[in-house]
Swiss-Prot record:
Record note on quaternary structure: Homomer.
EC top class named in words: hydrolase
Reaction it catalyzes: GTP + H2O = 7,8-dihydroneopterin 3'-triphosphate + formate + H(+)
Pathway of action: Cofactor biosynthesis; 7,8-dihydroneopterin triphosphate biosynthesis; 7,8-dihydroneopterin triphosphate from GTP: step 1/1
InterPro entries tied to this protein: GTP-CH-I_C/QueF (IPR043133), GTP-CH-I_N (IPR043134), GTP_CycHdrlase_I (IPR001474), GTP_CycHdrlase_I_CS (IPR018234), GTP_CycHdrlase_I_dom (IPR020602)
Lineage: Bacteria, Pseudomonadati, Pseudomonadota, Alphaproteobacteria, Rickettsiales
Keywords, comma-separated and alphabetical: GTP-binding, Hydrolase, Metal-binding, Nucleotide-binding, One-carbon metabolism, Zinc
Family (UniProt): Belongs to the GTP cyclohydrolase I family.
Name assigned to this protein: GTP cyclohydrolase 1
Enzyme Commission number(s) from the entry: 3.5.4.16
GO terms for biological process, alphabetical: one-carbon metabolic process; tetrahydrobiopterin biosynthetic process; tetrahydrofolate biosynthetic process
Binding site for Zn(2+): 79, 82, 150
Gene3D superfamilies for the chain: 1.10.286.10, 3.30.1130.10
Keyword Transmembrane helix: no
């Protein structure tokens, strides 16, 4: 698949404006195709970014703690089914084996995956598996809680529904006590 030119993308926006009954040549919409293309470049900037590159700076220290938990990483993504936003928080825990990363690196991983067309279930797995693959901890737990515009703006019109997804690797997948501890900790905030 070849990537369309910027002009082709702008023409596609004009076509969508016509489809909804708007006139793309009216004053308020003249620059809209450019704005949409610029917005999409930022919103979907997660494509082509390498998680391994983000996680390449590791600290190999004796860990004086058992678990590492980072809560409330805020994100906004777009569902691949309707291209409508969903937003929420990500909680990440891992049990280090011999290395850790700075906490901003975990937030950057969330941003990489959130800035793509997504489904929440897949994003949860991608975050957990990328931490597992790159840090090789004893285990990883990821929980995402999100509100989906495709549920609130259309269809069933449920604006208070929150979807929760979890994915576990290593000792979190193998031992219930670790999962239980993680879920209890994330519920306390």
């Amino acid at each position: 698949m070849s990537k369309p030119t910027r002009e082709e993308a702008k023409e596609a926006v004009r076509t969508l404006l016509k489809f909804i009954g708007e006139d793309p040549s009216r004053e308020g919409l003249l620059k809209t195709p450019d704005r949409v293309i610029n917005s999409y470049a930022e919103i979907f900037s997660g494509y082509g970014k390498d998680v391994a590159e983000i996680l390449n700076t590791k600290f190999y220290e004796t860990c004086n703690f058992r678990d590492f938990i980072l809560l409330n990483i805020k994100f906004t993504s777009f569902c691949e089914h309707h291209i409508l936003p969903f937003n929420g928080t990500v909680d990440i825990a891992y049990v280090p084996d011999n290395c850790i990363v700075g906490i901003s690196k975990l937030a950057r991983i969330v941003n990489i995956f959130a800035r793509r067309l997504q489904i929440q279930e897949k994003m949860t797995v991608q975050i957990a598996e990328s931490v597992q693959e790159n840090l090789k901890p004893l285990g990883v737990a990821v929980k995402i809680s999100a509100v989906h515009s495709c549920m609130s703006m259309r269809g069933v019109m449920q604006d208070n529904s929150v979807m929760n997804t979890m994915h576990y690797t290593g000792i979190f997948a193998e031992q219930q006590k670790y999962r239980h501890e993680f879920l209890n900790f994330t519920a306390k905030r």
